[in-house]
Every structure is written in C-alpha cells, then in structure tokens.
Amino acid sequence: LVLPEVYDQDGHPLRIGQRYIINNP
C-alpha cells in the first residue's frame, strides 16, 4: 500500500505508524 505524503504547515511529512494525518487548511 502506497500512501500519498501529507505535509503540515511547516512542510514536514506527518505520519503515525502507517497512517497519515491530513490537516484541514
């Protein structure tokens, strides 16, 4: 399973285990 990389407002990838966190703008 390939997940898209999600970045926070600082441009750092967010990931906990195998789950990505998506911040709402």
Curated annotation (Swiss-Prot):
Which keywords appear in this protein's UniProt record, sorted alphabetically? Protease inhibitor, Serine protease inhibitor, Thiol protease inhibitor
Q: Does the keyword Transferase apply?
A: no
Report the GO molecular function annotations: cysteine-type endopeptidase inhibitor activity; serine-type endopeptidase inhibitor activity
Secretion signal span: none
- Write out the tissue specificity statement of the associated record: Cortex of tuber.
UniProt keyword Flavoprotein, yes or no: no
Q: Which InterPro entries match?
A: Prot_inh_Kunz-lg (IPR002160)
Q: Which domain of life is it from?
A: Eukaryota
Function per UniProt: Inhibitor of subtilisin. Inhibits moderately trypsin and chymotrypsin (serine proteases). May protect the plant by inhibiting proteases of invading organisms.
Homology family:
Belongs to the protease inhibitor I3 (leguminous Kunitz-type inhibitor) family.
Q: What's the protein here called?
A: Cysteine protease inhibitor 2
Question: What's the source species for this entry?
Answer: Solanum tuberosum
